């Protein structure tokens, strides 16, 4: 099979996907005025000539030498609360801040967000990232959604999170988040995990976590392409690894401050959807894609405040754990659809109906690292969120519950006794 040639390509990842096709990734050359090169993931049909077809040449064309206009990809969360939608528009010149971009609209009746007789939904640009697919000065734009009257849609969870993070009490605490996004790759036409025999199962879990080798690691090229594309886009991605279940991967974003955490997770999910789309692989964030003795998929959220990170911060961590225990049901109800299939008390999870915490215990609701305990300061890990959670909801709730919400003294005392917390 011929290898596709990409002009001035500085890096390449190749995956054999099917006969007559080569999957490759590369960086295009720098454009006019020092415009950033673009990271490309391509499905290239190669015939006897081995020449990149004209369609691919057009897709990879750098327009910066020819025009100041740029393409802005407006991205928003759809009606299900987990689906990602986007559409493109031309902007007259490069932009550096979302305030430079116009509001836009779309047909909300086609996304389950508005009735047909009053279907217009307004997009408010909120954050911009470099576009790793188009390169140059083109941008990806995180938007939230409003009615024409300026009211946030019920699916606009960013609006409430922004209110929480703009509260002076929250701002003083400079909340940090490190989010571990797990996901599963599926074979397109059979909806079965990548690398698994169709209609069958691989060997038991054990050899696959952080593994290498064609018989143990499935989808590394997608994970690597996503990693590099996120770095290019300006996402604060901090790592990636193969997960316990074969065909499942994880990447980490953070530490991020406040609302930035949600923006970075949503844009990273969008980029991952685009890469899997081009690779002909299905991405699922289902928290338990395969029933049985297989790990589910979570979105563990590491969290700290300024007080937790300072000397003596472990006492503040314990106080936060106490508050979280008192609002366990509220958090569980907002931590992702289908999470009851994952939080069973098995496969490194706590039982969904019982709040628990522990040091270095991955079977607890809240885990505290040994390093945090030893230093007397640090962070906590909320292990309850599902892989399909909304990061705006989870980060906002963590800040609200641990900084703004005040339990009654009686409830606090009872919870402290139950959890053996001396606060």
From Swiss-Prot:
Q: Give the stretch annotated as transit peptide in the record, renumbered to this chain.
A: 1-51
**Key word Signal present:** no
Q: Which GO terms describe its molecular function?
A: ATP binding; glutamine synthetase activity
Iron listed as a keyword: no
Name the source's superkingdom: Eukaryota
Q: Where is this region: Disordered?
A: 89-115
Subcellular location(s) per record: Plastid, Chloroplast
Identify the main location.
Answer: plastid
Write down the EC number. 6.3.1.2
Question: Could you tell me which InterPro entries the record lists for this protein?
Answer: Gln_synt_N (IPR008147), Gln_synt_N_sf (IPR036651), Gln_synth/guanido_kin_cat_dom (IPR014746), Gln_synth_cat_dom (IPR008146), Gln_synth_gly_rich_site (IPR027303), Gln_synth_N_conserv_site (IPR027302), Glutamine_Synthetase (IPR050292)
Task: Give the catalysed reaction(s), semicolon-separated.
Answer: L-glutamate + NH4(+) + ATP = L-glutamine + ADP + phosphate + H(+)
Pinpoint the GS beta-grasp domain residues: 70-150
One GO BP annotation here?
glutamine biosynthetic process
Coiled coil ranges (UniProt) are none
* GO CC list: chloroplast
Which key words are in the record? ATP-binding, Chloroplast, Ligase, Nucleotide-binding, Plastid, Transit peptide
Segments forming domain GS catalytic: 154-423
**Entry's PANTHER family?**
GLUTAMINE SYNTHETASE (PTHR20852), GLUTAMINE SYNTHETASE, CHLOROPLASTIC_MITOCHONDRIAL (PTHR20852:SF118)
Give the similarity note. Answer: Belongs to the glutamine synthetase family.
Q: What does this protein do?
A: The light-modulated chloroplast enzyme, encoded by a nuclear gene and expressed primarily in leaves, is responsible for the reassimilation of the ammonia generated by photorespiration.
| Known partners and oligomeric status | Homooctamer.
Listed name of the protein: Glutamine synthetase, chloroplastic
